[in-house]
Design a protein with these regions (language model features):
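TM-lumen/periplasm interface segments of multi-pass membrane proteins
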Residues: 1-109
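Membrane-interface alpha helices of multi-pass inner-membrane proteins
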Residues: 156-181
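Structural signal for the C-terminal ends of transmembrane alpha-helices
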Residues: 95-105, 145-151, 181-186
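Hydrophobic alpha-helical membrane-interfacial segments at the cytosolic entry of transmembrane helices
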Residues: 185-202
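Short acidic/glycine- and proline-prone juxtamembrane loop motifs at membrane-interface regions
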Residues: 126-134
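Membrane-embedded alpha-helical segments of multi-pass membrane proteins
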Residues: 88-93, 135-140, 166-172, 193
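Membrane-interface transmembrane helices that cradle and orient dolichyl/undecaprenyl
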Residues: 134, 141-157
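Short helix- or helix-capping micro-motifs
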Residues: 114-119, 163, 167
Length: 202
């Protein structure tokens, strides 16, 4: 579609036609770099775990950029350090998601086709442009689904931890815990809730 319609068709996929490029990510990084001030000064709504990871990531960004007034948040492209930090973080998360998808129980050819189809689908391309932490949460949500019916107790527990971690980043993945209740796996649901509370509090 983009090849047929040209540049205007391509950028129409993105938020505000690409004029707010990657700003979910950069705004969040700038907010989280304030530490506790992210809540007291910036009034952010991200859960603590998400802000902790964003704060750690902010350590890679030039302090000069992080300290600029809010109206200059979109000037990240003037800072080579900010560009390189973003590219490295994005590449790491992208690779992690690809590796998780390649664990799907299909033939090698189907796994590769699935990975390419998912990672280059329209919703994911839009998600890349926003740079939102939902991408990271989705990785752990997929791990939960992959291990849900595993015969290994360790794998199932890893799945529960992954669901709890996903919920500690974005909250709404917690709704997938309803699957445990539907299958009457109450003990596992209880442990998942405990994991989630600990990750939210700690």
């Amino acid at each position: 579609r983009a090849l047929a319609g040209g540049a205007n068709t391509f950028i129409s996929v993105f938020h505000l036609h690409g004029t707010d490029l990657f700003m979910d990510f950069f705004n969040s990084i700038r907010d989280a770099s304030r530490g506790a001030g992210a809540y007291t000064d910036r009034y952010v709504m991200y859960p603590p775990m998400a802000n902790l990871l964003l704060w750690l990531a902010s350590r890679l960004f030039p302090q000069e950029y992080l300290d600029t007034p809010g109206k200059y948040a979109g000037t990240w492209h003037y800072y080579p350090g900010a560009i390189l930090a973003f590219l490295c973080l994005f590449a790491g998360v992208f690779l992690a998601f690809a590796l998780v998808l390649l664990r799907e129980p299909y033939s090698r050819k189907k796994r590769r086709a699935l990975t390419v189809a998912v990672l280059f689908s329209l919703p994911f391309v839009f998600l890349y442009e926003r740079g939102n932490t939902v991408f990271l949460a989705l990785i752990f949500l997929v791990i939960f689904v992959q291990n849900y019916d595993s015969e290994s107790k360790v794998a199932r527990e890893a799945g529960l931890l992954s669901l709890a971690f996903a919920a500690s980043l974005k909250l709404y993945p917690a709704i997938f815990g309803a699957v445990l209740l539907t299958d009457k796996r109450y003990k596992e649901a209880g442990r998942c809730v405990i994991y989630g509370i600990l990750l939210l509090v700690l």
